[in-house]
């Protein structure tokens, strides 16, 4: 297992701050099982896998963006259903009074 350096990652990312954000988001996705690693796992933790993927030149944000879009759609649906249920409960309470 080769050591991952910040310099290796910065060849593919604009700055250190962007590197931290991208690696953290990708590590979170890997940890939750939302995606398969693009490099061999080699018994590494998700944060190291994310950094190795970035150092290898993979676009780690592409899958994350697709997943975030799906999550937003799901969140909107959940909010809409919750609002409907709240209205139904409120109208039921009003009719009881």
UniProtKB/Swiss-Prot annotation:
SUPFAM superfamilies: RPB6/omega subunit-like. GO terms for molecular function: bacterial-type RNA polymerase core enzyme binding; DNA binding; DNA-directed RNA polymerase activity. GO terms for biological process: DNA-templated transcription initiation. It comes from the Bacteria. Keywords: DNA-directed RNA polymerase, Nucleotidyltransferase, Transcription, Transferase. One of its GO terms (cellular component) is cytosolic DNA-directed RNA polymerase complex. It catalyses: RNA(n) + a ribonucleoside 5'-triphosphate = RNA(n+1) + diphosphate. The keyword DNA-binding does not apply. InterPro entries: DNA-dir_RNA_pol_omega (IPR003716), Pol_omega/Rpo6/RPB6 (IPR006110), RPB6/omega-like_sf (IPR036161). It holds the Pfam family RNA_pol_Rpb6. Disulfide bonds: none annotated. Belongs to the RNA polymerase subunit omega family. This is DNA-directed RNA polymerase subunit omega.
């Amino acid at each position: 297992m080769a050591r991952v350096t910040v310099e290796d990652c910065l060849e593919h990312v604009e700055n250190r701050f962007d590197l931290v954000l991208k690696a953290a988001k990708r590590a979170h996705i890997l940890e939750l099982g939302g995606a398969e690693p693009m490099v061999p796992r080699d018994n590494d933790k998700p944060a190291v896998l994310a950094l190795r993927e970035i150092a290898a030149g993979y676009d780690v944000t592409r899958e994350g963006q697709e997943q975030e879009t799906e999550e937003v759609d799901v969140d909107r649906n959940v909010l809409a259903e919750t609002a409907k249920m709240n209205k139904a409960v409120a109208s039921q309470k009003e009719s009881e009074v």
